[in-house]
Amino acid sequence: MMKRLENGQLFTAMCTILIKINFIVYLLKKLYPMKGPLFYAKILLFGEYGIIKDSKGLAIPFSSYKGALKSSSNLSGEALKSNQNLIKLYDYLEANASELVSFDFTSFKNDIGSGMYFDSSIPQGYGVGSSGALVASIYDQYAHNKITILENLTRDKLLKLKEIFSFMESFFHGKSSGLDPLNSYLSLPILINSKTNIEPAGIPSQKEGKGAVFLLDSEQVGETEPMVNIFMNKMKNEGFRKMLNEEFVSYTDACIDDFLHGNINSLFGNVKNLSKVVLANFKPMIPMAFHKIWEQGLKTNDYYLKLCGSGGGGYILGFAQDYEKAKNSLKDYKLELVYRF
């Protein structure tokens, strides 16, 4: 009799605990309705424009900014705008069916109708992969037979993912390498050796030294497609093509090798050369207000600047051997730390 009572009490206690857990889960879903996992921003440390022409690139996840699919029965403001953009993305993917990937369009459409939106802190038009994170989240949620991050990611699987993401992100930019969504989806540093050779990269762990990589906020929104169009027009010029192959790509590749192998002194020499080449040949991609401080960094050696993504606004990437000195030189601007040497 006693055992029965004990068992009965235990059962009742377990039921009570389960009810409480379910109630907490219910409350959390109500307060923070989320359909999918978090996807992070990315920073292309090296390789902007060069990767279009098959040179090296190195991208790293940037966890300060992130986004996730959520839903709300009362959409307004940015959430409503995001929901409307998802409708356009849905229409694009459905109208441009690809053999690369298929989607559960029924669930996708129903979820949009139920108030789904992409809740993101990633600034748009800033070169840190806002559309890439969105594309990664849609693939993760709705792709059939998706390649998961838990699999053994062979080179062929990575290339297929990159191709899928290139197709999906072309909705936003007209032409996409697929690298931003790939980086966001994997949440790993990615080394691009060429269009057909990409791999996860091991980057040196951060140190508590003086040196740093940082973001400089231009406080202007940049658009990728016009910048890429300017670049493609420049590529028609033989002199520009020569500069790209002999200088831009050469310094970019050297920077990547130095960064991955921790050759800091050599890295800053190559970053300075790259910064000079970009200022001389990519001026339309650098906001006018930043031409002088770009030159100032090259003269003083307090910092060196380079494009972050396609340019035209958004963030500018900075490298400094003494971050405190760079902060003092750029005290009138908003800086954000990315990586410590």
Predicted segment positions?
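Alpha/beta catalytic cores of group-transfer enzymes, especially the acyltransferase/condensing modules
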Residues: 156-201
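Phosphate-binding site recognition
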Residues: 131
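Acyltransferase
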Residues: 201-256
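ATP-binding N-lobe of GHMP and related small-molecule kinases
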Residues: 9, 27-127, 140-156, 304-307, ...
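Glycine-rich, charge-dense phosphate/pyrophosphate-binding loop(s)
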Residues: 48, 52, 249-341
